[in-house]
Amino acid sequence: MIAYCAKNRIPVEASAKKPYSSDRNLLHISYEAGILEDPWMDAFAPANKAMFKLSVSPEDAPNKPEYVELEFRQGDCVAVNGKKLDPLGVMRTLNKLGGRHGVGRVDMVENRFVGMKSRGVYETPGGTILHFAHRQIESLTMDREVMHLRDSLVPKYAELVYYGFWFAPEIGRAHV
């Protein structure tokens, strides 16, 4: 496929040196296919260092921790280290902060909607920080039964979103 694209001057990021696809948005970058189809291939090996765009390898991260203070209002992060930010600014700031410390790398095999398995390697430094911080706040503010309900509903909600059922009746009921 890479040769076909090159021959027909179709611009793609995949190449002989980067034999995988990537998809990027504000929350994460996903890497799939190509060399990643081999489940025994170590995605985090030094030879694959160039694949990652948002984060350094934990081995290359500073040995000194960097502390971050997040401010939440009605469940949303509104400030990082005392600086008020819009959602875009929060994600950009946390992606940079987490990325320089090797936070947020994930290697997993997914079960797709059609039943096939697919390996994905992800970078989500800002998402990892926000998720962890929000869970800590929830542990302080939610009672046990509400947390149990959350833990039973969140996987189904996430599955519906993952499958593209954003406008399905189930999603509408979850928003009530």
Residue ranges and their predicted role:
Residues M1-H175:
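Nucleotide-activated chemistry modules centered on ATP-dependent adenylation/adenylyltransferase
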